């Protein structure tokens, strides 16, 4: 025979209220993290309201930012100004404060950043190198030279077994792959166009695209073959960043000199549209749901919001002076 336990009405209401409280407590707020180079600050933008919810000071000339896998910490490369920078700011996002400024010693101009497998990978432009910082020990525990001038941006896969760097001065992309042991690495230098800077990997992991800042082209690299299979002439004046949409259908490229974001149809390998966003667009971040792109318009001191369905500007956010690098986090 089945037995049933009857819960008094008042207790049932209490249980429902408790369940609702749990749901509310688990609700997370999306934030856009924006670096303001001239202000030397990180602005935290609440994307529910598009208002700046807080600011944190960084080192001089913060250019790029990434976030730990758990969303607790942000890491900022302090590129410097006339004097090359040599520090990385570690920021507690809950407390909204810098908790450590990592001294990189002889490594200069930290730039591209990526967090993978519990560690921070970054480029050191002056040193033509990629290095790794372990937050658990507070130490730089790995360093690899690329042999290429101005190693600028970096992409790293989830287990940190493969990475790609855009080498502006070397007119190349370095494909860096772990060998038979964690200490063995293989580097393939892939020649591309003039001044590769913006770089991203397709969502399916099969292609790396890099935009040339000095000849208006985009090189498409077959990851498996480690070679360029196609070059698209987009006639950009000075491309800066390149990002895929999450569905892999579009690529967005910022053109600093024209003030445009060039939208590329990936399947057709052709320009689909140009969206004029303002003076000197630089960093690009695309929301994980693929609905919007955020473009740091450094010359106008704002972040333009592009609706990726209509490919029209949907708003602007004032974050500080000379915005550039951005990251996304939910807390």
Role assignments for model-derived ranges:
Residues 4, 10-331:
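Predominantly soluble domains enriched in secretory-pathway, periplasmic, or organellar proteins
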